[in-house]
Amino acid sequence: MAQETNHSQAPMLCSTGCGFYGNPRTNGMCSVCYKEHLQRQNSSNGRISPPAASVSSLSESLPVQCADGSVPDAQSALDSTSSSMQPGPVSNQSLLSESVAPSQVDSTSVDKAVSETEDLQGPRAEGLVPLECDPPSSVSDTTQQPSEEQSKSLEKPKQKKNRCFMCRKKVGLTGFECRCGNVYCGVHRYSDVHNCSYNYKADAAEKIRKENPVVVGEKIQKI
């Protein structure tokens, strides 16, 4: 048993024959030889894949072809769509024709509407007869009355008599106005002096009748 354990623990040399000890984890090679082995594998894989220089050359050749005129199909499709989306040049004549057309339509429609209204109103207007209405007489009388009152108010008020009717003496504010309608001075103010025409007796009798009505008892009816 001891011999077997010693035999298993004995170191093993590198499989490449470099003289160093190998490791079963690195396929029996030493660390240096294992690194070189990995580098060789990587280099061999890189030769199979296309180099970076060829890729850059392809990317440079594409814009050159586009400049020469050989445009890819995708680029031509994009150009065609963009050209279809862009509006074409609009001429001044087309704009003028579009602006004039609505105005002509509006004017023609207005003329038709006016002609129709005239046709409808024509027979009715011919059949109608204007009526003349005279203002009522009461209204005319009421309008004339204020005018007459205004004319009277505009007239100058009559001046009061300031002279005695008998002696023609100026009495001013000290004159006495009699019931007969004349003004007299202090001497001629009495009715018996200036022979007054006013009937004082009849006036007094009328006042007595109004103030003292006749009182008559009811008659006794016989049974």
UniProtKB/Swiss-Prot annotation:
Residue numbers binding Zn(2+) 2: 164, 167, 185, 188
Positions that bind Zn(2+) 1: 14, 18, 30, 33
Function: Involved in regulation of TNF-alpha induced NF-kappa-B activation and apoptosis. Involved in modulation of 'Lys-48'-linked polyubiquitination status of TRAF2 and decreases association of TRAF2 with RIPK1. Required for PTS1 target sequence-dependent protein import into peroxisomes and PEX5 stability; may cooperate with PEX6. In vitro involved in PEX5 export from the cytosol to peroxisomes.
Record keywords, A-Z: Acetylation, Apoptosis, Cytoplasm, Metal-binding, Phosphoprotein, Protein transport, Transport, Zinc, Zinc-finger
Effect seen on changing residue 30 to S: Abolishes interaction with PEX6 and ubiquitin. Impairs interaction with PEX5
Record-listed Zn(2+) 3 binding positions: 178, 180, 194, 196
Taxonomic lineage of the native organism: Eukaryota, Metazoa, Chordata, Craniata, Vertebrata
Protein name, per record: AN1-type zinc finger protein 6
Zinc finger (AN1-type): 158-204
Recorded GO CC terms: cytoplasm
Species, as recorded: Mus musculus
Subcellular location(s) of the protein: Cytoplasm
Gene that produces this protein: Zfand6
Residue positions, PTM N6-acetyllysine: 219
GO annotation terms (biological process): apoptotic process; cellular response to tumor necrosis factor; negative regulation of apoptotic process; protein targeting to peroxisome; protein transport; regulation of canonical NF-kappaB signal transduction
Zn finger region (A20-type): 8-42
Domain observations: The A20-type zinc finger domain mediates regulation of NF-kappa-B activity. The AN1-type zinc finger domain mediates association with TRAF2.
Phosphoserine carried by residues: 49
